[in-house]
């Protein structure tokens, strides 16, 4: 059986997916031979193409994932697609693709058709504070490196927290307001990882969405287990690849 390619779709308000996924990418390659690629999201300003200046909405982010999946399919391969947090909403929009072998949701969402990222987050008792800027984007509001680290990466060291903070970015407001047009997780083999020490997304919200996955597993980590416990994440990926 050919080894699939792993595509990683990062969460909201950050850039450089390759950096976020790299601790797991390295261990995954070593243990399974699976190579990883990060999908760049136009809504986070991550494109060098003609659309870079205009940002993008959920549909543009989904198109970026579809393009990456088309590349995998053109090479005769299959893909495992990982969505972290907001990335799961991108998977819902674009996950029903012939190249997809498995979807992995990490502290994430499996939304119904017509859901918006903004409405999903608004149900949280202590939502991440954001504000609009003057360019049609939203930015994190009221955080510094210490408070960001304490909320999103409390199980990482200070150097990692700082490197993560330096990769936060503004995101196109439309990404939070675009209703999903598909439930791409439906009918696709999937795993949901619930992070039980997550200080960003409540365990209750994670569990409600995880019930929709083919299987779910709970890990004792903060919001970014692929940084802090790559061994546990690789263990889960290896399990469904067997």
Task: Provide a role label for each language-model segment.
Residues 35, 41-80, 94, 118, ...:
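Active-site loop/oxyanion-hole signature of alpha/beta-hydrolase fold enzymes
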Residues 96-140, 172-175, 201-202, 208:
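Flexible "cap/lid" loop of the alpha/beta hydrolase fold
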Residues 163-184:
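Active-site nucleophile elbow and catalytic-triad environment of alpha/beta-hydrolase enzymes
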Residues 82-87, 91:
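Gly/Ala-rich beta-loop-alpha elbow adjacent to hydrolase catalytic centers
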Residues 3-48:
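Conserved HGGG/HGGXW glycine-rich cap/lid loop of the alpha/beta-hydrolase fold
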Residues 195-227, 239-240:
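Conserved loop-alpha-helix segment in the C-terminal half of the alpha/beta-hydrolase fold
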Residues 8-13, 85, 108, 195:
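Glycine-rich His-Gly loop
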């Amino acid at each position: 059986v050919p080894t699939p390619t792993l595509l990683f779709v990062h969460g909201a308000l950050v850039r450089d997916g390759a950096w976020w996924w790299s601790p797991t990418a390295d261990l995954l390659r070593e243990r399974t031979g699976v190579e990883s690629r990060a999908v760049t999201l136009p809504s986070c300003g991550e494109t060098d193409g003609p659309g870079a200046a205009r940002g993008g909405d959920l549909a543009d982010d989904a198109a970026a994932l579809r393009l990456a999946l088309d590349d995998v399919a053109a090479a005769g391969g299959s893909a495992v697609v990982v969505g972290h947090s907001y990335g799961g909403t991108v998977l819902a929009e674009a996950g029903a693709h012939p190249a997809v072998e498995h979807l992995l949701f990490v502290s994430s969402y499996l939304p119904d058709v017509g859901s918006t990222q903004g409405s999903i987050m608004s149900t949280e008792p202590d939502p991440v504070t954001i504000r609009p800027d003057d360019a049609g984007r939203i930015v994190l509001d009221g955080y510094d490196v210490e408070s960001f680290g304490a909320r999103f990466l409390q199980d990482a060291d200070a150097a990692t927290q700082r490197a993560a903070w330096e990769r936060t970015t503004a995101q196109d407001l439309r990404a939070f307001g675009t209703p999903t047009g598909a439930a791409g997780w439906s009918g696709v083999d999937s795993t949901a990882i619930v992070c039980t020490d997550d200080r960003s997304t409540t365990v209750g919200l994670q569990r409600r969405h995880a019930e929709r996955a083919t299987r779910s597993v709970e890990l004792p980590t903060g919001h970014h287990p692929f940084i802090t416990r790559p061994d546990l994440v690789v263990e889960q990926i290896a399990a469904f690849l067997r």
